[in-house]
Amino acid sequence: MAEKNKQDDIKVIATNRKAYHDYFIEETIEAGIELKGTEVKSVRLGHVNLKDSFARVENGEVFLYNMHISPYEKGNIFNVDPMRDRKLLLHKSEINRLAGYVQQKGYTLIPLKIYLKRGKIKVELAVAKGKKLFDKREAIAKRDAELEIRKKMKEYLR
């Protein structure tokens, strides 16, 4: 039987685009997430917001904070708090490695995206270091310069 392409069965549900602007991404890791039934349905519909969310290692477990999952419309009494803390599912060795990173000054854990992989909801978690204001300005200036160069080259080649 033919092998399936691994990229074919990944469907991105939500991304944290601000994370790349506000942080230097050091390392990424894939984690499962513990959700209730109506939360799963809401996430599959794309009603999730990663803005201002972060993760923290506590007592050998990793929890995701400030991630908003809108209540499922047809969930009535089964809906839970949209901003509740959610446990991330990782191996103990991965948790220990992340804890070592986070103990260093300036490092934090942030979710980059939520996606479906083989029917399971996964979170791409990043070890990140915050950018200073001048770093952000430098990145914007560099991006603008590259855009200007591309425009000039396109104009020149016409």
From Swiss-Prot:
Subcellular localization: Cytoplasm
Tagged with keyword Cytoplasm: yes
Keywords carried by this UniProt record: Cytoplasm, RNA-binding
GO cellular component: cytosol
GO molecular function, one term: RNA binding
A Pfam family this chain is assigned to: SmpB
Principal localisation: cytoplasm
Source organism superkingdom: Bacteria
Family of this protein: Belongs to the SmpB family.
Name used for this protein in its record: SsrA-binding protein
Species annotation: Caldicellulosiruptor saccharolyticus (strain ATCC 43494 / DSM 8903 / Tp8T 6331)
Gene this chain is encoded by: smpB
